[in-house]
Amino acid sequence: MTHPPKTPLLDQVIYPADLRKLEDRDLPQLAREVRDEMIDAVSRTGGHLGAGLGVVELTIAIHSVFDTPDDRLIFDVGHQCYPHKILTGRRDRIRTLRQENGLSGFTRRAESEYDPFGAAHSSTSISAGLGMAIAADLDKNDRRVIAVIGDGAMSAGMAYEALNNAGALDARLIVILNDNDMSIAPPTGAMSAYLARLASGRTYMGFRDFGKKLTAYLGKNIDRAITRAVEHARGYVTGGTMFEEMGFYHIGPIDGHSFDHLLPVLRNVRDNARGPVLIHVVTQKGKGYPPAEAAADKYHGVNKFDVITGAQARVKPNAPSYTSVFAEALVQEAALDDKIVGITAAMPNGTGLDKLAEAFPSRCFDVGIAEQHAVTFAAGLAAEGYKPFAALYSTFLQRAYDQVVHDVAIQGLPVRFPIDRAGFVGADGPTHAGSFDTAFLATLPGFVVMAAADEAELKHMVRTAVAYDAGPISFRYPRGEGVGVDMPARGEILQIGKGRIVKEGTKVALLSFGTRLADCLLAAEDLEAAGLSTTVADARFAKPLDHDLIRQLARHHEMLITVEEGSVGGFGSQVMQYLSSEGLLDNGLKIRSLVMPDIWMEQAKPEAMNAHAGLDRAGIVSTVFRALGRGVAVGVAG
């Protein structure tokens, strides 16, 4: 383990007010020290490295020029917020990032007044910033609002909806487009810096304002013509863009690692801008740390790593990950069925669809951060007889719920939804937890909703989804490795709406939906040791429910517990609805539903989160004993 870096200048900066006391010539040294501090911290905690390293100069420049927190600074997604946290009173806790009771890996309103808006999902910053800018106008307050958004987040329609609205409202909003994909040639040399300063200065902005005042007297048609003439005239020097067509004053691109470029432009915009401004800043992911510069994709999100070599800590898995099992099973099926296609929303590696893209590049589509489009795109493919697998994280499927309902479910189109990161996800906290998919999908008529109990079951569900053409079908599975069961050479086609008995008993029935099955089996051992004969069943389906299985468990056991790593309103609620409608609660059946608690659970290790929720072995046993009026006198086996 390396020693923390020496940071004499950073040691003088606790809050941005301290930063604003520094001379401009000191800022490059401060940037080096912030980078060193961030690299050391993330090497100890893991987290998002590349994005933060890429915005060190930009973050320092913004806090140097603007009066934060009175001026509002909003980061889109939040992957790049670590330098911001270091400079806003949280450096003393930066080595608790993403740990239980530690700093969030994203911006969070409850954490600091310097985080005016929380983030973790993409493309929300401009909308939130516009709301704050309009609030400032209504309050007759001259505070500035700055939204920093990456080029990747600009692939989502919500960002353009906000830009369009901001332009129409002529809002006092500053949008900084952080272009770290190098998709647009980076600016170089003094001429680029000069043009950016010129375009952000009083003369050019005054020319634009004069045009606006003139057209106020001449009607809408003349207004549009003169406004476009002004922007196009400026475009000959600075480059015209679609942002100008939306009503934004566009500046850049400028070098996001040069204070000589950043400071004068930001100061000009601060002092002169009266309407919406977009500053195009080009940065490099991983800037200042050679391993991250050389492999930006591998250093976007990292485990703990060696600062000297860049080597990341890897724990040898005991079993393959659920994501890899899904990917391999899908590739296997795709080799046998050329109607199978894969769709991902900017997460090919995270969802495992990169494996499908390698094997069948023409049948795998990365649509960018555009979940709504992804789902309706899949619906169009399904309408033409293809078998689309729209692989999304549970938390991101939420972004496309209307499309799931309107474009897929109502039309009964056979779109397949592999739902990754179901349940607790650990360090990313409540914004990324896969809590709600079972609840919001199982309410939809005609939807088939499955959950894999282990990696072999997941393989069965992939093949089942391939074979099912009667309507939409989903299957959920968690982050991380499987439980180590024997794997079939190929998955089996499951009977729709049928679960399975895993262990027979007579007094207590544990009905699991998903990967809590392993803990149910362990809990059954402890209950048997306490003299309570226990049945364990794997539901497999939340919709359609296995009515025969549920009736059998209800009629032949004193107690029934449903167990799921999902929210209130999910599988357990579906079971309860069926039991009540069939009168199966009328004869004194004791029933309990174990779910994720109805709170926003903070980051921790998934096993700790399951224990807190009562979804682990000990929690299940404790629930049984309490329901039966017995003290927990028998120790739970370790």
Curated annotation (Swiss-Prot):
Native source organism of the sequence: Rhizobium etli (strain CIAT 652)
SMART domains: Transket_pyr
Keyword check for Magnesium: yes
Entry EC number(s): 2.2.1.7
Cofactor info, note text: Binds 1 Mg(2+) ion per subunit. Binds 1 thiamine pyrophosphate per subunit.
Pfam families, A to Z: DXP_synthase_N, Transket_pyr, Transketolase_C
Reactions catalysed according to its record: D-glyceraldehyde 3-phosphate + pyruvate + H(+) = 1-deoxy-D-xylulose 5-phosphate + CO2
Molecular-function annotations in GO: 1-deoxy-D-xylulose-5-phosphate synthase activity; magnesium ion binding; thiamine pyrophosphate binding
Top EC class of this enzyme: transferase
Binding-site list for Mg(2+): D151, N180
PANTHER family per the UniProt record, alphabetical: 1-D-DEOXYXYLULOSE 5-PHOSPHATE SYNTHASE-RELATED, 1-DEOXY-D-XYLULOSE-5-PHOSPHATE SYNTHASE, CHLOROPLASTIC
Requisite cofactors: Mg(2+); thiamine diphosphate
Binding residues for thiamine diphosphate: H79, A120, H121, S122, G152, A153, N180, Y289, E371
Secreted among keywords: no
The name this protein goes by in its record: 1-deoxy-D-xylulose-5-phosphate synthase
GO biological process terms on file: 1-deoxy-D-xylulose 5-phosphate biosynthetic process; glyceraldehyde-3-phosphate metabolic process; terpenoid biosynthetic process; thiamine biosynthetic process
Family membership noted in the UniProt record: Belongs to the transketolase family. DXPS subfamily.
Annotated keywords: Isoprene biosynthesis, Magnesium, Metal-binding, Thiamine biosynthesis, Thiamine pyrophosphate, Transferase
InterPro entries xrefs: Dxylulose-5-P_synthase, THDP-binding, Transketo_C/PFOR_II, Transketolase-like_Pyr-bd, Transketolase_BS, Transketolase_C, Transketolase_CS
Function: Catalyzes the acyloin condensation reaction between C atoms 2 and 3 of pyruvate and glyceraldehyde 3-phosphate to yield 1-deoxy-D-xylulose-5-phosphate (DXP).
Pathway(s) of this molecule: Metabolic intermediate biosynthesis; 1-deoxy-D-xylulose 5-phosphate biosynthesis; 1-deoxy-D-xylulose 5-phosphate from D-glyceraldehyde 3-phosphate and pyruvate: step 1/1
Self-association state and partner proteins as the record states: Homodimer.
